[in-house]
UniProtKB/Swiss-Prot annotation:
Entry keyword set: Cell cycle, Cell division, Chaperone, Cytoplasm, Isomerase, Rotamase
Organism: Brucella abortus (strain 2308)
Upper lineage: Bacteria, Pseudomonadati, Pseudomonadota, Alphaproteobacteria, Hyphomicrobiales
Protein name per its UniProtKB record: Trigger factor
UniProt GO cellular component terms: cytoplasm
EC numbers for this chain: 5.2.1.8
Length: 471
């Protein structure tokens, strides 16, 4: 096999491979001889089938197998010999001339093909011990815990029918019919719907217009669906609702005790408070980690600048772009609605894709140098969590993951990344800073400015939360 480098520009490589016809013939002769000892063909004694007869019957199919084996093995062996790592599976380019292909299968021509690929850039891990980040910490007050406990326990609250007008926190039972331009719309009607006024269950402006109504009252209210409403055909639209009030009920006093906790499946009120505190701590902890991770990624982004494999960038951009367009479509909006153009959006998200790929490569190199590994137990837990996301399809999803290595690799990647972040956190300067809940949850100005187009609080946020870019 003759291997010749025909392109070496930046990360791009092209390798021409020539397998002489004589080498192919030698492999075919060896395979025919092996088959001769096993062949069972009518008219011939076992092991006595003439090679020429076997060649006539199986020569082309055997040669096709040999060619496929060469193609499958060549990428791995050539990359190993050149001490290179391909960013993606090398592209194989062969002649499309059918007559030429027939000559190869007949053993009358050399087998010639090319491998096109991009190599992973060589990355020298720099000293990251001087990276400094601020970790925001919120002290969770008893008042905040009690407020959340009350909110959760309110689901157990009972109501008592009353004759007066509906007030805030009363529960009303209504029939309603929604209309757009005077015509009923799908999903806009219900009977005996129960709604606690002030709960925010319905769209803004709906509940407020029911205050003051009594059982038996009828009213037509007008509301405007939010621009970001999930149903695109309703987003930003003005609609009317024909309302008929069937019952008004006042809330009974909410008692917080062990019995209330038991109704929620918790053994005691004290344990309920503990569970709620742990949930709040977990929520704040996730926000804090994402903010710290963004700071780390920003620092690494400033330290590492190198050419990125464009095929990886293309794949990452396509994933982002698909999500952006899906979010816009769901919201019934366009790039013009976001005060930008498709061209400008493409340019921005292309930069985001390049950043993701670059940081992903940096984190991978840091993790490899540090000996970070994903254990089998961690991977199995991720597989189990993924399977649980599809109730009723568990076996199909599990079988898919078992036979699809790339899908399992996609589950492994975020685990590996988080372990690399843990490694970095243990070796950089981290300063804790106490902040309020409002300060912690406030949207980062930089993230907000980057969020054009495709909705600051929606599409861009989703795009930024993928892969190695929670920042």
């Amino acid at each position: 096999m003759q291997v010749t480098e025909t392109l070496n520009e930046g990360l791009k490589r092209e390798i021409k491979v020539v397998v002489p016809a004589g080498d192919l013939e030698a492999k075919l002769a060896e395979r025919l001889e092996t088959a001769r000892g096993r062949a069972r063909i009518n008219g011939f004694r076992p092991g006595k089938v003439p090679t020429a007869h076997l060649r006539k019957m199986y020569g082309k199919s055997f040669m096709a197998e040999i060619v496929n084996e060469i193609l499958n093995d060549s990428s791995r062996s050539i990359l190993a010999e050149r001490n290179e790592k391909s960013a993606t599976q090398p592209e194989v380019i062969m002649s499309e001339d059918e007559k030429e292909a027939e000559k190869v299968l007949d053993g009358k021509a050399d087998f010639v093909f090319s491998l096109n690929y991009e190599v992973l850039p060589a990355i020298e891990v720099k000293d990251f011990s001087k990276i400094a980040v601020t970790r925001e910490v919120v002290d969770i007050s008893d008042e905040e815990v009690d407020e959340q406990v009350k909110r959760i326990a309110s689901s157990t609250r009972t109501f008592e029918t009353k004759k007066g007008k509906a007030e805030n926190e009363d529960r009303v039972t209504i029939d309603y019919l929604g209309k757009l331009d005077g015509e009923p719309f799908e999903g806009g009607a219900d009977n005996d719907a129960q709604l606690v006024l002030g709960s925010g269950q319905f769209i803004p402006g709906f509940e407020e217009q029911l205050i003051g109504l009594k059982a038996g009252d009828e009213k037509v209210i007008t509301v405007t669906f939010p621009a970001e409403y999930g149903a695109a055909h309703l987003a930003g639209k003005e609609a009317t609702f024909d309302i008929k009030v069937k019952e008004v009920a006042k809330p009974n006093e909410l008692v917080l005790d062990d019995e209330t906790a038991k109704k929620l499946g918790i053994e005691s009120l004290e344990r309920l408070r503990q569970v709620v505190r742990e949930q709040i701590e977990s929520q704040y902890g996730q926000i804090t980690r994402q903010k710290v991770k963004r700071q780390i990624l920003d620092a690494l982004d400033g330290d590492y600048q190198f050419e990125t494999p464009q095929k990886l960038v293309d794949a990452e951009f396509n994933n982002i772009w698909q999500q952006i367009n899906f979010d816009l479509q769901q919201a019934g909006r366009t790039f013009e609605d976001e005060e930008t153009t498709e061209e400008a959006a493409r340019e921005e998200y292309r930069k985001l894709a390049e950043r993701r790929v670059r940081l992903g490569l940096v984190l991978s190199e840091i993790g490899e140098k540090a000996g970070v590994e994903v254990t089998e137990e961690e991977l199995q837990r991720a597989v189990y969590d993924q399977v649980r996301r599809y109730p009723g399809q568990e076996k199909e999803i599990y079988d898919f993951l078992r036979r699809t290595p790339d899908a399992v690799a996609n589950l492994r990647a975020p685990i590996f990344e988080e372990k690399v972040v843990d490694h970095l956190l243990a070796n950089i300067n981290v300063t804790d800073k106490k902040v309020s809940k409002e300060e912690l949850t406030a949207e980062d100005e930089d993230a907000a400015s980057e969020a054009k187009p495709a909705k600051k609080a929606a599409a861009k946020k989703k795009a930024e939360e993928g892969k190695s870019e929670e920042a």
